[in-house]
């Protein structure tokens, strides 16, 4: 989930010489974005055109010519697994760390698929109190359009409720590590040491600075990551969320919060005015679900040109 503390964790891990953590990018993974198999030289040119038309990937500062040459050295067909390995190798060519980490929080919902593509990979998930996540989201503005990352709390709470089904369905294993953000803030050194052991990394540090890799247009989202974690901000949500926001989140995700050791806060009964706001949250959420369903259904019943129009105009509101 956005604003869960993953950039702080990326900065802390990047301090170690064995580890390289990438920026996020909209890659053709066939999971979150349209996939693409590379089976010819023409496909390489097409994938390069696609990658270098994406601002997030351009921020990786990988030379197009160099990347093309590396892809030509790779056996066809090249799927997402092979492509990502080449991209990370090129991205960290100067540092040459032995552990390469691709940062993408949304992959938590697709672990089974990713395990098939990367059977030897390890996964790190950072868990944070959803009340704090939402509080941070509503104060942060997306770099692509300047809008708040969140404007009402139901989506954050609903996503948080999916975590037990996603995390706990995995059998006991040595490839998934769940780290609580609050533990990272309060006992960072010990938590990082445990994580290094999980990754098989040494404790040797480097002078690398993850903040320097972040594109200028995104730096405002991560202004504090160079500073030590602020323990006084861990529960700032308790004073900054409105009562309606707090009640909404706890009504939806209360069981999941307590399941992961987070205490619920007692609140007074909502006033009539606050109840109206609560109702509007649900009305807005229902409208969002209807629009999503309309986009999906139109794909099967409308001509392609009409579907693309519906997708373009309704997806703005999803």
Which functions belong to the PLM regions below?
Residues 23, 32, 137-138, 207, ...:
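Short, flexible helix/strand-to-coil boundary loops that buttress conserved ligand/catalytic motifs
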Residues 1:
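P-loop (Walker A) phosphate-binding loop of NTP-binding proteins
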Residues 45-62, 82, 102-103, 108-114, ...:
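Anion-recognition interface
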Residues 77-90, 94, 108-109, 117, ...:
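PAPS-dependent sulfotransferase catalytic domain
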Residues 168, 201-318:
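PAPS-dependent sulfotransferases, especially Golgi type II membrane carbohydrate sulfotransferases
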Residues 7-19:
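A conserved segment at the C-terminal end of the G1
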Residues 21-102:
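PAPS-dependent sulfation machinery
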């Amino acid at each position: 989930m956005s604003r869960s503390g993953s950039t702080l964790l990326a900065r802390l891990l990047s301090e170690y010489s064995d580890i390289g953590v990438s920026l996020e990018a909209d890659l053709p993974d066939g999971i979150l974005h349209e996939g693409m198999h590379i089976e010819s030289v023409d496909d390489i040119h097409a994938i390069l055109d696609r990658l270098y038309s994406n601002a997030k990937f351009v921020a990786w500062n990988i030379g197009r010519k160099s990347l093309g040459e590396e892809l030509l050295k790779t056996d066809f067909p090249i799927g997402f697994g092979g492509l990502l390995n080449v991209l990370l190798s090129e991205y960290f060519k100067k540092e040459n760390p032995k552990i390469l980490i691709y940062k993408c929080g949304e992959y938590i919902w697709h672990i089974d698929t990713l395990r098939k593509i990367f059977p030897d990979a390890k996964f790190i998930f950072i868990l944070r109190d959803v009340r704090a996540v939402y509080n941070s989201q509503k104060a942060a503005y997306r770099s692509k359009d300047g809008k708040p990352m969140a404007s009402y709390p139901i989506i954050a709470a609903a996503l948080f409720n999916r975590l037990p089904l996603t995390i706990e369905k995995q059998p006991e294993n040595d490839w998934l590590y769940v780290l609580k953000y609050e533990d990272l803030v309060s006992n960072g050194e010990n938590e990082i040491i445990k994580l290094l052991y999980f990754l098989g990394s040494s404790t040797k540090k480097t002078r690398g600075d993850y903040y320097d890799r972040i594109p200028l247009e995104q730096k405002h989202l991560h202004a504090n990551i160079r500073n030590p974690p602020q323990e006084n901000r861990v529960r700032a949500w308790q004073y900054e969320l409105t009562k309606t926001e707090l009640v909404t989140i706890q009504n939806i995700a209360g069981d999941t919060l307590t399941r992961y050791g987070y205490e619920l806060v007692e609140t007074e009964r909502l006033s009539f005015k606050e109840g109206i706001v609560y109702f509007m949250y649900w009305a807005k959420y229902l409208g969002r679900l209807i629009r999503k369903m309309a986009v999906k259904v139109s794909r099967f019943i409308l001509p392609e040109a009409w579907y693309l129009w519906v997708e373009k105009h309704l997806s703005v509101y999803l």
